């Protein structure tokens, strides 16, 4: 299994499983001289944490990050930064009854077919639990970009099922458990999620992520275009089934006279491209949108096969999210930060 590292100059390697003893990350390529403590990383991890509200998974992990290397006297040394988060609330017994079954919509079937073996405890390596280390690594990238480049990243939930944000108030995003920018819709979201819990079902979501202060020139055509790497990073997040940059699929119905981002002496007159042109950042805001599928771990019985090929029925037990997108905002922010950090260092290396 070789796909556990991300980036070229700013690289992140993660390891660990959903119900193993711990998860780890090695962050290599962070420049020396960045002020960094565990307190800089913890807030983003807490934003992703389960068990904070009745609307998400009730798995309760303290998720306290530990810096094991790469930092001396509160400053990065330029050597690899090792991060550790222990798993404290594992309940593998929740999966003992389905250990020989392939849960529909999960990686159980494909992992087994590829490797001939799988960790059935919550999906093992395929679990979204792994993303906590991406968030930890992303927090380092976000801090560097914010302090050294004046580049900021913020995400929010744009839609849950048919409930869409009618107004975007970014100041409201951190004030509710849904990361939702439209406070008027919060009661409707609460009702929807609680009904899904009662029904044992799930729903999809759409997230938007915005990067401001991105310098012009990031991206390496033709095979390492900035928007291509962003799309790849976002598609690597569990349950993501679609990614849009800028206007995305809406461009199908647009005319060139509308879509082209015309220029004036004051700058661009629009941003339909979402901050990149020909795979290179234009200096405008990077606009990314992600579609999350409804979680497949639900209490409604479904048809499947066991490892011997026998047709069976499965009901997924355990502690699961009615909407996996509700905890994904910090993950999407982290992945965008990792891409931009990597490309910024590559840009600096070329420019000197």
Swiss-Prot record:
InterPro entries the UniProt entry points to: Chorismate_synth (IPR000453), Chorismate_synth_AroC_sf (IPR035904), Chorismate_synthase_CS (IPR020541)
A Pfam family of this chain: Chorismate_synt
UniProt keyword Amino-acid biosynthesis, yes or no: yes
Record family assignment: Belongs to the chorismate synthase family.
Gene Ontology molecular function, alphabetical: chorismate synthase activity; FMN binding
One Gene Ontology biological process: chorismate biosynthetic process
Co-factor note (free text): Reduced FMN (FMNH(2)).
Protein role: This reaction introduces a second double bond into the aromatic ring system.
Annotated positions binding NADP(+): 48, 54
EC nos: 4.2.3.5
Gene name of the record: aroC
Subunit composition and interactions: Homotetramer.
Swiss-Prot/TrEMBL keywords: Amino-acid biosynthesis, Aromatic amino acid biosynthesis, FAD, Flavoprotein, FMN, Lyase, NADP
Biochemical pathway: Metabolic intermediate biosynthesis; chorismate biosynthesis; chorismate from D-erythrose 4-phosphate and phosphoenolpyruvate: step 7/7
Binding site for FMN: 125-127, 238-239, 278, 293-297, 319
Catalytic reaction equation(s): 5-O-(1-carboxyvinyl)-3-phosphoshikimate = chorismate + phosphate
GO CC term, one of those recorded: cytosol
Cofactor: FMNH2
Protein name: Chorismate synthase
């Amino acid at each position: 299994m070789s796909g556990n590292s991300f980036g070229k100059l700013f690289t992140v390697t993660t390891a660990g499983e959903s119900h193993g003893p711990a998860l780890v990350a090695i962050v290599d390529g962070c420049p020396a001289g960045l002020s960094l403590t565990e307190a800089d990383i913890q807030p983003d991890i807490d934003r992703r944490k389960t068990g904070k509200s009745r609307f998400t998974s009730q798995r309760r992990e303290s998720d306290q990050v530990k810096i094991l290397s790469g930092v001396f006297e509160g400053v990065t040394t330029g050597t690899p930064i090792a991060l550790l988060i222990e798993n404290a609330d594992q309940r593998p017994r929740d999966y003992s009854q389905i250990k020989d079954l392939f849960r529909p919509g999960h990686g159980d079937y494909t992992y087994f077919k590829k490797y001939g073996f799988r960790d059935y405890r919550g999906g093992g390596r395929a679990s979204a639990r792994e993303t906590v280390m991406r968030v930890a690594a992303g927090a380092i990238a976000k801090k560097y970009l914010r302090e050294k480049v004046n580049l900021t990243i913020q995400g929010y939930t744009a839609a849950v099922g048919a409930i869409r944000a009618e107004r975007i108030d970014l100041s409201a995003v951190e004030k509710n458990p849904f990361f939702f920018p439209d406070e008027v819709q919060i009661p409707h979201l609460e009702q929807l999620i609680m009904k899904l819990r009662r029904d044992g079902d799930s729903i999809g979501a759409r997230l938007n992520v915005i990067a401001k202060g991105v310098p012009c020139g990031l991206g390496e055509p033709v095979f390492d275009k900035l928007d291509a790497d962003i799309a790849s990073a976002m598609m690597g997040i569990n349950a993501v089934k679609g990614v849009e940059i800028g206007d995305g699929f809406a461009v199908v119905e647009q005319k060139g006279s509308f879509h082209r981002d015309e220029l004036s002496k004051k700058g661009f007159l629009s941003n339909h491209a979402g901050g990149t042109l020909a795979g290179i950042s234009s200096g405008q805001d990077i606009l990314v949108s992600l579609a999350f599928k409804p979680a497949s771990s639900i209490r409604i019985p479904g048809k499947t096969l066991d490892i011997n090929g026998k047709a069976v029925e499965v009901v997924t037990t355990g502690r699961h999210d009615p909407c996996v997108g509700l905890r994904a905002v910090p993950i999407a922010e982290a992945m965008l930060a990792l891409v931009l950090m990597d490309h910024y260092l590559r840009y600096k290396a070329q420019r000197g």
